[in-house]
Structures are given as C-alpha cells and as structure tokens.
C-alpha cells in the first residue's frame, strides 16, 4: 500500500485483541515444541515473540531484521541483521528446534528469506494472508490479501467514521 492508495479493507487490532491472538498462537505452539529459542522478525515480530517466549518459557530470544517497507511503500528486501551464530548453532545450523515469530505473513517474501536462513525452523505468525499462508507452519487468523492490518503500535486514539456514508 502506498501513501496514495487505500487498502481494500481495514482491520484495526487493539492491544487486548493482539494479546489474546498471541496467547492463542502460543496454545497451538505448545503442542509443537519444545523450542530452544525464539527468533523475532523485526520489528513486527518483537511484540508477539515476547508474549510467545514468556508463555512457552523460552529464555533465548534473537532477532532477524529484514526491511520490506519504507513507510507504507513496499520496497526491495534487505537484511539489516542476521540471526546470531549462537542461535543458529542451537538449531544445528538448519533451525531445528527454533521458532520464528512474526506479526503477519503477507506475500511471503520476508518468510522466504528467513526460511532460506534456517529451513527447519518452525514459522509462526499471528495473522496470515493467502499469498503468505503456505510459508507458515502455525497462525491464528487469516485475512484477505487486500486487507490492511492496523497494529496497535501503529495507531493513536482518533475519531472513527461510520462504515456507511451518512450513518452518523
């Protein structure tokens, strides 16, 4: 989505809802583990990774930083920070026993880059869109490809107009 375009559908997520969705993700992941470490895809994966790591009792948390957006404009993927060697070793170099966490898998471009780094890791996202869904192992909510998710850290308190024109 660019600054000059609007999403097909808006999906605002409150802090309470996001926390509930992260805990629901953890319930599903609890049956899959145990995990040696959590790898958050920054920045969106930081908050869900913290919640998931707490609930699963995982103490080792690492990050991989991949930039795919410049403000609201999609850009070429760029790895700013790789997974640490110590974390990669925990996964035997292939990611086995590692849990990758992100807020959203959209087109799957970021997921493909991380999968190439640690192919045997378990990939979890709170939300998934159809193009990215095949790349995640566990997710909670699927939204349509034309939906723009407004995460709580991107929102401020403001007037919300009615969905239907003239309904106010």
Swiss-Prot record:
Belongs to the purine/pyrimidine phosphoribosyltransferase family. XGPT subfamily. It catalyses: GMP + diphosphate = guanine + 5-phospho-alpha-D-ribose 1-diphosphate; XMP + diphosphate = xanthine + 5-phospho-alpha-D-ribose 1-diphosphate; IMP + diphosphate = hypoxanthine + 5-phospho-alpha-D-ribose 1-diphosphate. This is Xanthine-guanine phosphoribosyltransferase. One of its GO terms (molecular function) is xanthine phosphoribosyltransferase activity. The keyword Cell inner membrane applies. It is found in: Cell inner membrane. Mg(2+) binds at residue 103. Xanthine binds at residues 106, 149. 5-phospho-alpha-D-ribose 1-diphosphate binds at residues 43-44, 102-110. Pathway: Purine metabolism; GMP biosynthesis via salvage pathway; GMP from guanine: step 1/1; Purine metabolism; XMP biosynthesis via salvage pathway; XMP from xanthine: step 1/1. Guanine binds at residues 106, 149. Keywords: Cell inner membrane, Cell membrane, Glycosyltransferase, Magnesium, Membrane, Metal-binding, Purine salvage, Transferase. Its main location: membrane. GMP binds at residues 106-110, 148-149. Its cofactor is Mg(2+).
């Amino acid at each position: 989505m660019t600054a000059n375009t609007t999403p097909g559908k808006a999906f605002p997520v409150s802090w309470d809802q996001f926390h509930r969705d992260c805990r629901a993700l953890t319930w599903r992941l609890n049956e899959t583990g145990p995990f040696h470490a959590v790898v958050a895809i920054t920045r969106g994966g930081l908050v869900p990774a913290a919640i998931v790591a707490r609930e699963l009792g995982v103490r080792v948390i690492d990050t991989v930083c991949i930039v795919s957006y410049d403000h609201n404009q999609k850009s070429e993927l760029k790895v700013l920070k790789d997974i640490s060697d110590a974390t990669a070793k925990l996964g035997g170099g292939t990611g086995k026993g590692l849990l990758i966490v992100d807020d959203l898998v959209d087109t799957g471009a970021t997921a493909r880059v991380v999968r190439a780094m640690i192919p045997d890791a378990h990939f979890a996202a709170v939300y998934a869109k159809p193009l990215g869904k095949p790349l995640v192992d566990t997710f909670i909510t699927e939204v349509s490809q034309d939906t723009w998710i407004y995460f709580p850290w991107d929102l401020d308190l403001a007037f919300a107009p009615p969905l239907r024109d003239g309904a106010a």
